[in-house]
Structure formats: C-alpha cells, structure tokens
Regions:
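Contiguous, often N-terminal, cationic amphipathic patches that form binding interfaces
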Residues: 1-50, 55, 74-79, 83-106
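Generic structural marker for isolated residues within well-ordered, non-membrane alpha-helices
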Residues: 58
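Short acidic capping loops at alpha-helix termini that bridge into adjacent secondary structure
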Residues: 69-71
Length: 106
C-alpha cells in the first residue's frame, strides 16, 4: 500500500506531520501504522497551533504538486499528526509521478 491512492474523483494522500521542526521537508521514508497503512513523513517549522502547521503543509503540497490550495482539503486529522488529505483533481499519471517524487530518495 502506498501513501496515496485514487479516491472518489481525485486522490487521497496520507501524511504524518511533524510540526515545529528545524526545516520544512518531505521525508525520505514512510510511517506504517499497525494496520499497515503508509503515511508520508512531512516536517514543517510552523508550530501546531490554530491550524498554522496544517496551512503550511497545504502550501508545501500546493507548491510541489503545482496544485491550488483550494483543490486540497484535510478530511481527517485536523488536530492529529496523522492526516488524510483529499486532492480534488483527476488522478492522472502526471499527478501520480508528482506524488511519488515527494518521497525523497535516501
């Protein structure tokens, strides 16, 4: 299982967010929960208060995926480190390649 999958008319992206980090970065590996579900590790320098870290995460995703923030929505995990983000654009090969490229190589 990957940290993303086609979902409805778009894509579901699973993220493990680490706020208050030294730098904004996408991780080189994934977090796997007890059920085997993968989450891409992402760190942001912003603190986790009043949704600031979530906003920073969406900005990072928008910039790297070249998608408007308005096309993304955190559908699960507003106040948790484990998040599910719905990307409301067609799941194409191009989008899949961009998502794969988020995971940095070690």
């Amino acid at each position: 299982m990957s940290f993303f999958e086609p979902y409805k008319n778009g894509c579901l992206l699973r993220i493990k967010l680490a706020p208050n980090a030294a730098k904004n970065a996408f991780g080189a590996d994934v977090f796997v929960d007890a059920s085997g579900t993968e989450y891409l590790k992402v760190s942001v320098v912003t603190v986790a208060e009043k949704g600031k870290a979530n906003k920073e995460l969406l900005k990072m995703l928008a910039k790297n995926l070249k998608i408007a923030v308005s096309n993304m929505e955190i559908i699960c995990g507003q106040t948790d480190h484990l998040k599910k983000i719905f990307i409301n654009i067609s799941f194409t090969t191009e989008l899949e390649q961009k998502l794969v490229s988020l995971k940095k190589e070690k």
